Each structure stands twice: as structure tokens, then as C-alpha cells.
């Protein structure tokens, strides 16, 4: 007789994954949640723009600011893009289910770093006393973003074949860890006397 298992129904959902991009891809690729510190999540406001992007008749950079729906910032102004992962995941799926998804499968939203690049670039120009021309702002802003997320951007570009410094990333939620584990008491002992489960092996500590 084995040890009892608990909480098999609890599953983490990770909102920041590279979506499926073709028939050859067997699973979604996990990206770091840290990207939401600086990236702004959006989909087109107009259905015709979403369709045009899916059909590759439009690029995301061609969608003007006023035609972008930063839906997390709109729905949760106090938290914006830093809402809890379950909220971000549900909101992304809702937008995609409503027909606003932006990749070929309709299961992706944009994670855009243009605002962060501009903000960091202006800060760096001010710090170093440099004229904040558009080119200088972008160059210095991209350096800061590269220092923070360069390895993730490199991984994304290798998989998707698009430069995330210039074009918004595409992301979509994916199932992550199963939260269940071996049942333990307050002393971390399982239902097998003398057998203990410590850390993520037990049901309560993941």
C-alpha cells in the first residue's frame, strides 16, 4: 500500500509562454514572468486588424496606439500588466476566444517592450547628458532591456524568428506545474509511518 496523494486538481497556469507556431511544435515554450515587469500586453481593438495580422496582411507595428487594447491596464488599472498569473491567463484566453488572437492559430496576445525601451532610453540620455534623439533613445533603451532580458529575447528570436526589440513578442498561457503531491501531516510525515516528504514532493509546499 502506497502513501496518500492530495490536491491533484490544482494546476498552475503560466501566462507568459511562446505560443504554438506550427504543426511541428509539440509544446509551448515557457518564458519568464519577469517579462511582465516591463512588457505591455495588448491585442488590436478592431476585429479586422486582428484578422489582418493573423493572415499576415498587417504587422503589429502598423497598428496605431489608439487602436491597441491594453486590456489588463484597462480592466485592472491599479495593477496593470502585473496582475496575478491566473488573472492574466484568463484575460488572455478570453480575448483570444473572442477572436482577437494575433497568431495563425488565434491563440496569442502581444507583449510589447517599445514603451520600456523608450522610457529607459530617455532616462539614460538624461543621466549621461546626451541629446535624446529618437535613435539615441532607442539604442540606449535597448541596451538596458538587453541587460535585463537578453537571454529570453535571444531564445524567443531563435524559436519565432522575429526580433522582439523591434516587434512585440507573442505570448499565450500554458499549463505549468501540477500542484498536488504526497499527503503529509504537520510534521511532514506521509501516511506511511516514518516516511517523510519535504518540499515540492508534498501537496502543500509547491
PLM feature segments, named:
Residues 46-49, 77, 116-118, 176-177, ...:
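Short, glycine-/Ser/Thr-/acidic-enriched flexible segments
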Residues 4-155:
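An anion/pyrophosphate-binding glycine-rich loop and adjacent beta-alpha core
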Residues 2-3, 36-38, 105-107, 160, ...:
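Short coil/turn connectors at secondary-structure junctions
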Residues 1, 205-206:
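A conserved FAD-binding loop/helix module that cradles the flavin
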Residues 1, 112, 200:
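Residues forming anionic-ligand binding surfaces in small-molecule and nucleic-acid pockets
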Residues 145-203:
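A glycine-rich dinucleotide-binding beta-alpha-beta segment and adjacent secondary-structure elements
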Amino acid at each position: 500500500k502506497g502513501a496518500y496523494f492530495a490536491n491533484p486538481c490544482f494546476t498552475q497556469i503560466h501566462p507568459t509562454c511562446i505560443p504554438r507556431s506550427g504543426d511541428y511544435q509539440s509544446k509551448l515554450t515557457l518564458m519568464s514572468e519577469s517579462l511582465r515587469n516591463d512588457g505591455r500586453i495588448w491585442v488590436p481593438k478592431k476585429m479586422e486588424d486582428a484578422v489582418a495580422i493573423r493572415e499576415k496582411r498587417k504587422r503589429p507595428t502598423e497598428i496605431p496606439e489608439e487602436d491597441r487594447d491594453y486590456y489588463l491596464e484597462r480592466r485592472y488599472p491599479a495593477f496593470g500588466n502585473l496582475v496575478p498569473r491566473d488573472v492574466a491567463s484568463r484575460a488572455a484566453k478570453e480575448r483570444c476566444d473572442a477572436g482577437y488572437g494575433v497568431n495563425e492559430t488565434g491563440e496569442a496576445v502581444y507583449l510589447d517592450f517599445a514603451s520600456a525601451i523608450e522610457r529607459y532610453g530617455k532616462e539614460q540620455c538624461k543621466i549621461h547628458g546626451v541629446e535624446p534623439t529618437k535613435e539615441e533613445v532607442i539604442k540606449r533603451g535597448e541596451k538596458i532591456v538587453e541587460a535585463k532580458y537578453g537571454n529570453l529575447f535571444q531564445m524567443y528570436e531563435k524559436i519565432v524568428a522575429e526580433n522582439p526589440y523591434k516587434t512585440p513578442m507573442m505570448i499565450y498561457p500554458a499549463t505549468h506545474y501540477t500542484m498536488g503531491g504526497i499527503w503529509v501531516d504537520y510534521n511532514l510525515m506521509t501516511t506511511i509511518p516514518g516516511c517523510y516528504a519535504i518540499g515540492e514532493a508534498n501537496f502543500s509546499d509547491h
